């Protein structure tokens, strides 16, 4: 099974991805997490350091794939999760999609791409150009991380449009939304009313989630010394269980940006009195 995790920049995708990866490993699955961001910090909370990227390794070996070994690019993270960072082209040059393609090519050359029960792509920000939408070409499911904010949901709609486009050519489905660090969900529910899709989980505004990123640890690792965090880990285990059940998922509805902008902004500004629907926009 292959998963692609997207969401607005800074929404907590990498923290969420790392904890989902550990949760899947706790369920007995062999998991590989692939960071698809030039910052190459996707797997930081799994490994505790910034691991070398595949692009760095290939450049050091003059792109001689035959000289690269699995241990050169695959690092063991917390909970037995294997970690890879694709890296990226120099700032202002090149294409991130090319980097993702080279990463998958190398892992296939190493016979590693098919050795895992679950491969999770953690993809940079809310960029949904053809390049950074590339992981959707390999994914069975897309997961979108959001919060209860207007901007994050607007970004989610753009990502949903990419899923819809990719689903034309292969059996990709949107597994659903994950609300991250939010005590409210009214705007999320308004969005899902307009664009029907599952809400896999909504994690409350828990400071330890943010702190875990700074510490370079997953919530599961932190829970070893602070058992009160086991309740937080249960959120990620619930997400893992839903994914492993191979949900039907959805091909998202086509909602024009302007219509959704009007709907969400109206509800955001007037949450009590708004009865507006997309049909009225």
Swiss-Prot record:
EC number: 1.3.7.7
Cofactor (UniProt): [4Fe-4S] cluster
NCBIfam families for the chain: DPOR_bchL (TIGR01281)
Function, as annotated: Component of the dark-operative protochlorophyllide reductase (DPOR) that uses Mg-ATP and reduced ferredoxin to reduce ring D of protochlorophyllide (Pchlide) to form chlorophyllide a (Chlide). This reaction is light-independent. The L component serves as a unique electron donor to the NB-component of the complex, and binds Mg-ATP.
PROSITE patterns the UniProt entry points to: NIFH_FRXC_1, NIFH_FRXC_2, NIFH_FRXC_3
Amino-acid positions noted as binding ATP in the UniProt annotation, renumbered to this chain: 10-15, 39, 180-181
Transmembrane domains' residue ranges: none
Self-association and partners: Homodimer. Protochlorophyllide reductase is composed of three subunits; ChlL, ChlN and ChlB.
Name of encoding gene: chlL
Catalytic activity field: chlorophyllide a + oxidized 2[4Fe-4S]-[ferredoxin] + 2 ADP + 2 phosphate = protochlorophyllide a + reduced 2[4Fe-4S]-[ferredoxin] + 2 ATP + 2 H2O
GO molecular function: 4 iron, 4 sulfur cluster binding; ATP binding; metal ion binding; oxidoreductase activity, acting on iron-sulfur proteins as donors; oxidoreductase activity, acting on the CH-CH group of donors, iron-sulfur protein as acceptor
Pathway the protein acts in: Porphyrin-containing compound metabolism; chlorophyll biosynthesis (light-independent)
Name of the protein in its database record: Light-independent protochlorophyllide reductase iron-sulfur ATP-binding protein
